[in-house]
């Protein structure tokens, strides 16, 4: 479990985080040669409920900010402990960003952490331009990359591409499942790829055995 009590955070936030009993697992993201690892995506694994249940509960109580802080601090701590050298991909709510005190605490505890980070903007719950401005300042100062998660779902559409100008776009599996036998999907994906590549963006496909079975 992540030792949140050791992190330099407000007592209220620490108390909430300590009660979550969260661990993190790391899913490798490969280069297109399917051999070399490009990044590790930190995936939250709460002990007492599913991730979806946890997010729904905190969204209902308007406390998603706590999960945002938990993910950045907890995932970074777990990543460093594992000794990984590849990029660390951290999920981030589009409606949240660090406070000034939290940003300072992050730098104090972990160092400046320049480079080797990818902030992956989730497709829910809602987009906040104010929070994105604050988040983008941190991203630029630290030379981090921005990834758009599950493009084609929720808030992550072309408007999000225009707003975030991400370095990486991850296509949602709904866009590609069954694409071999679906001319419309083929044309849609081709159009998206051309648009992303024209903007110098990389495209990532999340491969799973289920997706392979459906394709």
Question: Where do the language-model regions lie?
Answer:
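Flexible, glycine/charge-rich interdomain/linker segments that couple
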Residues: 1-7, 87-92
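Active-site beta-loop-alpha junctions enriched in small/polar residues
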Residues: 29, 93-95, 122-124, 151-153, ...
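Single conserved hydrophobic/aromatic residue that forms the stacking wall/gate
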Residues: 207-215
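Conserved, mostly hydrophobic/aromatic
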Residues: 35, 71, 119, 150, ...
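Bacterial c-di-GMP phosphodiesterase catalytic domain signature
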Residues: 98-105, 129-130, 151-201
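Structural preference for beta-strand elements that scaffold enzyme active sites
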Residues: 23, 87-89, 116-120, 145-147, ...
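Catalytic core of bacterial c-di-GMP phosphodiesterases, primarily the EAL and HD-GYP domains
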Residues: 65-134, 144
């Amino acid at each position: 479990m992540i030792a949140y009590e050791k992190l330099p955070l407000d007592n209220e936030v620490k108390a909430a985080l300590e009660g979550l009993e969260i661990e993190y697992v790391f899913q490798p993201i490969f280069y297109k040669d399917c051999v070399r690892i490009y990044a590790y995506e930190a995936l939250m694994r709460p002990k007492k409920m599913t991730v979806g249940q946890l997010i729904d509960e905190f969204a209902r109580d308007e406390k998603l900010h706590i999960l945002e802080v938990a993910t950045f601090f907890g995932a970074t701590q777990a990543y460093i402990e594992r000794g990984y050298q590849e990029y660390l991909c951290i999920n981030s709510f589009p409606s949240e960003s660090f406070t000034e005190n939290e940003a300072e605490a992050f730098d104090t505890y972990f160092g400046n952490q320049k480079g080797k980070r990818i902030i992956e903007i989730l497709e829910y719950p809602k987009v906040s331009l104010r929070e994105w401005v604050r988040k983008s300042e941190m991203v630029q100062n630290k030379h981090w990359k921005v990834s758009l998660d599950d493009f084609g779902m929720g808030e992550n559409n072309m408007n999000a591409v225009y707003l975030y100008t991400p370095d990486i776009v991850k296509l949602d599996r709904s866009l590609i499942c069954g694409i071999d036998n679906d001319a419309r999907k083929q044309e849609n994906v081709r159009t998206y790829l051309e648009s992303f590549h024209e903007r110098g963006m990389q495209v990532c496909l999340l491969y799973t055995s289920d997706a392979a079975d459906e394709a």
